[in-house]
Regions:
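Extracellular/virion structural assembly segments
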Residues: 1-159
Length: 159
């Protein structure tokens, strides 16, 4: 399992990527692979177990252990991430580009580890980029030879 305190800017310490805040320890984000980045983050499918009673009331019967995130990260640039030999099931640590927020004044607390230096307060809300320990679920890349672009997508779920 990767070390969560490690700065996962790139697997090769000689070529850190100064072009993005995205870090993927275990895969790496080389220079020229991170333009056009997008990240979605949401609950895993098993997190939602809602059922209706015989009277029609909606009840949440989900197990708190399933309160985990899934994420999809995609980009289009001139180079791909280091996907070679990185198969589904590999544990990785993602310093997200997507942000989460909570409201301490309402008794809410931060639910995930924050990427160091990413926390900020906006009015009553605290916003941060989470650091997630995940397993690769799937990835793909496509090459546009004539356009000299490589598109890629990484799907991962929190362990």
């Amino acid at each position: 399992m990767p070390d969560p305190s490690y700065d996962a800017s790139h697997d090769d310490p000689l070529t850190p990527n100064a072009f993005t805040v995205l870090r993927i320890q275990g895969v790496g984000v080389p220079p020229y692979s991170a333009r056009g980045l997008r990240q979605s983050i949401g609950p895993i499918d098993q997190a939602s177990q809602n059922r209706r009673t015989v009277n029609g009331a909606l009840k949440d019967i989900s197990f708190s252990g399933f309160q985990k995130y899934k994420t999809t990260i995609s980009g289009t640039d001139q180079r791909p991430p280091n996907f070679d030999g990185k198969w589904p099931g590999l544990t990785i640590i993602i310093d997200c580009i997507a942000e989460l927020s909570y409201t301490p004044d309402e008794g809410e607390t931060q639910q995930r580890t924050a990427v160091p230096g990413s926390e900020r307060v906006e009015a009553a809300h605290t916003v941060y980029r989470p650091r997630l320990t995940c397993k690769i679920m799937n990835f793909n890349q496509d090459h546009d030879e004539y356009g000299a672009q490589i598109g890629w997508t990484l799907d991962a779920e929190e362990v």
